[in-house]
C-alpha cells in the first residue's frame, strides 16, 4: 500500500508540465501547438525565448529529482524508489492534468538519475551534451544518452539485478519509444536541429496569444 501511494504521488508530481505552465506564465503559445508539438524544453526553445526553455528544463528535471529524493528521504526500500522513479517519469509522458499529452521525458529522466546516483546522472547528462554539441540534434542526443544510461549504471556502478537498475532500463526503453517519430525523421534527414525556429514560425509562431 505504501509503495502504491508513493507511486501515485510521484505520478502526480510528474504530471506537472512546466513547458505549458512556464509558457502560459510568460505569455507564450502552448508548446503543444507549434514546432514538434512536444511540451519540452527543446520545443519551448523554438519560441525564441531562452529563459522559458531554461525554466522548463530546470522544472522538469527538478520534479524527477524531487520524487526520488522524497522516497529516499522517508527511508523507502529500493523497490519503492524504483516504482517512484518510473511513476514520476510516466507522469511526465502522460500527465493527468494536461489530457495525457506529455513530453518525451529527457529532463525528467535526468532528474531521476541525479537523485538515484549523482554521478550516473552527470555521466548521462554529459553524454547528452557531447552528442548535442557535435550534432545539434536534441533527439539524437537523448537517444544516445538513453542507451548509455543503463550501461553506465551496470558497468560503472555495478548496479545489477536491483529494482532501481530495472527502473533505469525501463525509463530508457520508454524514452526511446517516445522518440520513435524522431528516429524516422533522423533517418529521413528531416529532423529539426537545436535552436531551429522555422517550424515554430510556420505553425503560426510561438510568441504571444497561445491558449493553454
From Swiss-Prot:
Gene for this chain: plsY
Complex and partners: Probably interacts with PlsX.
Annotated catalysed reactions: an acyl phosphate + sn-glycerol 3-phosphate = a 1-acyl-sn-glycero-3-phosphate + phosphate
Subcellular locations according to the entry: Cell inner membrane
Entry EC no(s): 2.3.1.275
Family that this chain belongs to: Belongs to the PlsY family.
BP-aspect Gene Ontology terms: phospholipid biosynthetic process
GO annotations of cellular component type: plasma membrane
Extent of the signal sequence: none
Protein topology in the membrane: Multi-pass membrane protein
Keywords attached to this entry: Cell inner membrane, Cell membrane, Lipid biosynthesis, Lipid metabolism, Membrane, Phospholipid biosynthesis, Phospholipid metabolism, Transferase, Transmembrane, Transmembrane helix
Name of the protein in its database record: Glycerol-3-phosphate acyltransferase
HAMAP family, per database record: PlsY (MF_01043)
Pathway(s) of this molecule: Lipid metabolism; phospholipid metabolism
Pfam family, any one: G3P_acyltransf
Job of this protein: Catalyzes the transfer of an acyl group from acyl-phosphate (acyl-PO(4)) to glycerol-3-phosphate (G3P) to form lysophosphatidic acid (LPA). This enzyme utilizes acyl-phosphate as fatty acyl donor, but not acyl-CoA or acyl-ACP.
Catalytic class of the enzyme: transferase
